């Protein structure tokens, strides 16, 4: 008898919460299936069924330890939270193409009561039940029917109640006979599921215990990162990410309040910064690449108006980290963190420049990955945005040429002194989507002799990347032409490099390994960088033009870019440091260029 009781012990949490166990498992499965993207190759989380089982069982175990009265209250609270979160999650997926994420939560926090009312009236219509929301509502309806089973039973006729009781008693007798075996099976599955889920649970714990949004993003680049596979986990992760972002926002606002401009000579009336995306200089024909991917930039260089810099690296190979380091007056190696220092557009605005930010990525959107959230949260914060920018575009575009239309709409606001920042989508994956099909000029056959070791699929991918680079060349050239008759200086740099079957490395995009070797640094951190000076600018500022040309072979890491920009504007401020300004006579060219704040780029050597 004691052995039987011991063997059936694993069944107690389920017996005491049978409705909870069954319907929460169904709810988890329905949510996973309802939020599976309708794209080729999309798959469910590989450990879904086992991890859902052990999570469900663990919740039942906790509930079973509560006194009966508290157990009922606990289940009611859990049902309310889990169903509400599930409905919100699948609704967001059906309406916006994304499950709950940090950006959605941030948008909710910035929504006032009027906007919330308009949203509810516009989007909460009966039609939503036809989508994924309807699946969750069906589970909820079945659960309600289950909860009302005793009331329904009492409404049956006496004969039907007796027949039902007989069947129930026979079923219970059969179940009692197999309880020991069922207990063993449940215990075995729980152990199996716990072991199989341990890695993901550890990964999720690392995400939830990260100390900054940047750390969260970096953890997500690891192959074994935690998967928040349930709506309630995604909600918790979104709340945590927003808490971390809010902490850095407070620091940035504090730094902004202390920012000061002592004087400004307005040396360069119009300064343009073009920030590209995922462009390593080894795919630029301007830097020696065999395929003609940058003919227009090369032509500008031959004209003498464009000065190409030869030794420039990015501080990170992640867009969000690059943006934080590029926008902050902080440089890697200085005391404190990036968010402890002012952002350079704030200083330009204080100095009297009209600052415009035109981006094809960092606008507040519901369907936004953590990477965009991490890079854009400080740019989209209402307080910081108002302190940095006078004008911004309101929409993103499929292709970067849409930004030129945005500029034309905002141009009249510029005034006599302007800083305009273009942020392109550039060569961001997926490469084939970065350029119109009609602009395809580079074909797979191009690589028959250049890269014969690549298979057909790889050569297609490479052609797409190089076509995206060629299209990017046309966009950059068109931006430069907007300023050819102005007293303007234009700086171009991508955020970081990109790999596309480089050498024998055999992969695309970037490798986010903590260890940085020579090849990784070469392909993912070395970037093109140049400065264009218009004919009018060259006539009016010969000394500064000469400085720009004289600095072209100096070492540079782009975290120091703001100090050069302040030099171009003639802004004097406590946060400006000449030793970080590549145009200054006091520039410290031997400052360690620490990639990811850890690896000295200039000490890396090729593998033998």
Where are these regions (language model features)?
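Histidine-centered active-site microenvironments of extracellular/periplasmic hydrolases
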Residues: 288-292, 491-541, 578, 583
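A short beta-strand-to-alpha-helix junction
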Residues: 335-342, 459-471, 514-527, 538-565, ...
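Polar, surface-exposed loop/tail segments
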Residues: 502, 545-552, 556-558, 570-604
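Active-site-proximal alpha/beta segments of enzymes that process anionic O-linked groups
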Residues: 187-449, 526, 557-588
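Transmembrane and membrane-interface helices of multi-pass
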Residues: 1-219
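A long, amphipathic alpha-helix that forms part
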Residues: 60, 405-408, 446-492, 531, ...
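Extracellular glycan-modifying ectodomains
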Residues: 89, 390, 427, 498, ...
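Short glycine/proline-rich turn/loop motifs
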Residues: 325, 387-389, 450-461, 540-547
């Amino acid at each position: 008898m004691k052995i039987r009781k011991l063997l059936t012990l694993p069944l107690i949490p389920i017996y005491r919460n049978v409705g909870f166990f069954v319907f929460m498992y169904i709810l988890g499965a329905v949510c996973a299936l309802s939020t599976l993207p309708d794209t080729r190759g999309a798959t469910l989380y590989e450990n879904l069924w086992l991890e859902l089982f052990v999570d469900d069982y663990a919740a039942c175990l906790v509930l079973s330890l509560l006194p009966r009265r508290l157990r009922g209250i606990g289940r009611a609270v859990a049902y309310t939270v889990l169903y509400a979160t599930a409905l919100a999650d699948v609704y967001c997926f059906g309406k916006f193409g994304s499950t709950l994420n940090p950006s959605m939560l941030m948008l909710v926090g910035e929504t006032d009561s009027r906007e919330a009312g308009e949203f509810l009236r516009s989007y909460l219509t009966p039609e939503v039940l036809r989508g994924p929301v309807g699946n969750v509502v069906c589970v909820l309806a079945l659960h309600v029917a289950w909860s009302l089973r005793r009331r329904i039973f009492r409404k049956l006729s006496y004969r039907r109640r007796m027949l039902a009781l007989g069947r129930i008693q026979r079923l219970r007798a059969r179940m009692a006979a197999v309880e020991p075996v069922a207990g063993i099976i449940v215990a075995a599955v729980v152990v199996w599921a716990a072991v199989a889920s341990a890695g993901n649970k550890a990964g999720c714990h690392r995400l939830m215990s990260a100390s900054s949004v940047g750390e969260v993003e970096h953890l997500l680049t690891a192959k074994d990162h935690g998967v928040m596979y349930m709506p309630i986990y995604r909600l918790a992760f979104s709340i945590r990410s927003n808490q971390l972002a809010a902490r850095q926002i407070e620091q940035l606002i504090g730094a902004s309040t202390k920012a000061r401009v002592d004087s400004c000579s307005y040396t360069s009336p119009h300064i343009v910064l073009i920030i590209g995306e995922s462009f390593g200089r080894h795919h630029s024909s301007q830097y020696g690449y065999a395929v003609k991917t940058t003919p227009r930039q090369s032509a500008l260089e031959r004209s003498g108006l464009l000065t190409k810099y030869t030794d420039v690296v990015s501080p990170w190979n992640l867009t969000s980290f690059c943006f934080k380091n590029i926008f902050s007056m902080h440089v890697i190696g200085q005391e404190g963190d990036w968010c402890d220092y002012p952002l350079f557009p704030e200083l330009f605005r204080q100095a009297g420049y009209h600052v415009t930010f035109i981006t094809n990525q960092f606008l507040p959107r519901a369907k936004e990955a953590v990477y965009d959230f991490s890079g854009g949260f400080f740019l989209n914060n209402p307080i910081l945005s108002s302190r940095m920018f006078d004008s911004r575009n309101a929409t993103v575009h499929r292709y970067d040429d849409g930004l030129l239309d945005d500029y034309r709409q905002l141009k009249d606001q510029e005034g006599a002194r302007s800083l305009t920042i273009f942020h392109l989508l550039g060569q961001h994956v997926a490469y084939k989507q970065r350029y119109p099909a009609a602009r395809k000029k580079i074909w797979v056959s191009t690589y028959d002799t250049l890269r014969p070791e690549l298979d057909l699929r790889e050569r297609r991918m490479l052609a797409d990347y190089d076509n995206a680079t060629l299209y990017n060349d046309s966009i950059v050239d068109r931006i430069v032409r907007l300023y050819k008759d102005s007293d303007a200086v234009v700086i171009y740099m991508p955020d970081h490099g990109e790999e596309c079957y480089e050498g024998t490395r055999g992969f695309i995009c970037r490798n986010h390994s903590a260890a940085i070797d020579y090849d990784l640094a070469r392909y993912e951190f070395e970037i093109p960088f140049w400065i264009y000076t218009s004919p009018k600018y060259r006539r009016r500022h010969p000394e500064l033009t000469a400085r720009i040309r004289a600095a072209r072979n100096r070492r540079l890491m782009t975290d120091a870019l703001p100090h050069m920009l302040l030099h171009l504007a003639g802004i004097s401020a406590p946060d400006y440091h000449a030793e970080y300004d590549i145009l200054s006579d006091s520039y410290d060219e031997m400052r360690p260029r620490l990639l990811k704040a850890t690896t000295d780029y200039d000490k890396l050597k090729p593998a033998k």
